[in-house]
């Protein structure tokens, strides 16, 4: 069973340290900066063997080269993004396996936020590291991909086991919650979740990870089939991707 350490960095990023105790193998997911990662490793006596990158944005790869210089770690990323991942050593294709001691992950292509975005799914640990594709109560902006690409990616993620823990890369949940209730205000589970999110943030506590079942019940970006959402958007009878695209468009201009 993986030990997972969540490290808050920058304004709202999370870096994750994954430690497989049987072998001592350790990986860092999306290290925006190196310093806090090195401090956490030193405090626990862990040795970094790998960096896993979900995409090429600077707040996800900014610590790659410093970590590589300090630890000799191997950088793992998507084959399609090898030209944009600093220090990449191992370029995986969709569905290929990454092993961390006795733990294993499948790399999943999930384009939309960027064209080369991927996620790492540790099935036996019910843990998904999805970068900026799926957020708690939200999803990533479409910087390079289309709404169709992002929707296919989200469909892929929402088909994972409901008990999957969703480790996204940012603490955006409070802002996402304020938008979500404008899209589906009649969702009682959403309203209850918003109250919990607000309480956690008042205490300075993290709202990440979430559970996929919770996202399926409350995240509007995963719920384009909802009759209430369709009615509020004036989009009855259209394909789910069109509903998703309209939700994303509204989120892009939301100020709340």
Curated annotation (Swiss-Prot):
InterPro entries: Beta-lactamase_class-B_CS, Clx_II_MBL, Glyoxalase_II_hydrolase, HAGH_C, Hydroxyacylglutathione_Hdrlase, Metallo-B-lactamas, RibonucZ/Hydroxyglut_hydro. CDD domains: hydroxyacylglutathione_hydrolase_MBL-fold. The keyword Chaperone does not apply. Pfam families: HAGH_C, Lactamase_B. Its EC number is 3.1.2.6. GO terms for molecular function: beta-lactamase activity; hydroxyacylglutathione hydrolase activity; zinc ion binding. Zn(2+) 2 binds at residues 59-60, 132, 170. Binds 2 Zn(2+) ions per subunit. Its cofactor is Zn(2+). SUPFAM superfamilies: Metallo-hydrolase/oxidoreductase. Keywords: Hydrolase, Metal-binding, Zinc. GO terms for biological process: antibiotic catabolic process; methylglyoxal catabolic process to D-lactate via S-lactoyl-glutathione. Pathway: Secondary metabolite metabolism; methylglyoxal degradation; (R)-lactate from methylglyoxal: step 2/2. Zn(2+) 1 binds at residues 55, 57, 113, 132. It catalyses: an S-(2-hydroxyacyl)glutathione + H2O = a 2-hydroxy carboxylate + glutathione + H(+). Thiolesterase that catalyzes the hydrolysis of S-D-lactoyl-glutathione to form glutathione and D-lactic acid. Monomer. Belongs to the metallo-beta-lactamase superfamily. Glyoxalase II family. This is Hydroxyacylglutathione hydrolase. It comes from Methylococcus capsulatus (strain ATCC 33009 / NCIMB 11132 / Bath). The gene is gloB.
């Amino acid at each position: 069973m993986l030990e997972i350490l969540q490290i808050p960095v920058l304004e709202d990023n999370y870096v994750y340290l994954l430690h497989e105790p049987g072998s001592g193998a350790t990986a860092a997911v999306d290290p925006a900066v190196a310093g806090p990662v090195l401090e956490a490793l030193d405090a626990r006596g862990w040795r970094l063997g790998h960096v896993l990158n979900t995409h090429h944005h600077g707040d996800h790869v900014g610590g790659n080269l410093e970590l590589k210089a300090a630890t000799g770690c191997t950088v793992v990323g998507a084959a399609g993004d090898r030209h944009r991942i600093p220090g990449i050593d191992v370029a995986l294709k969709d569905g290929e396996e990454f092993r961390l001691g006795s733990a294993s992950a499948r790399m999943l292509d999930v384009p939309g936020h960027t064209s080369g975005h991927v996620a790492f799914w540790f099935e036996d640990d019910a843990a998904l590291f999805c970068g900026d594709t799926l957020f708690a109560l939200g999803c990533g902006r479409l910087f390079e991909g289309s709404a169709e690409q992002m929707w296919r990616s989200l469909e892929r993620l929402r088909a994972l086991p409901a008990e999957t823990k969703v480790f996204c890369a940012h603490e955006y949940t409070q802002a996402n919650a304020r938008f979500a209730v404008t899209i589906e205000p009649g969702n009682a589970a959403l309203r209850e979740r918003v109250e919990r999110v607000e309480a956690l943030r008042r205490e300075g506590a993290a709202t990440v990870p979430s559970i996929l079942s919770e996202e399926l019940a409350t995240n509007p970006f995963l719920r384009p089939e909802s009759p209430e959402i369709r009615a509020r958007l004036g989009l009855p009878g259209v394909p789910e991707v069109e509903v998703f695209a309209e939700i994303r468009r509204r989120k892009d201009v939301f100020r709340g």
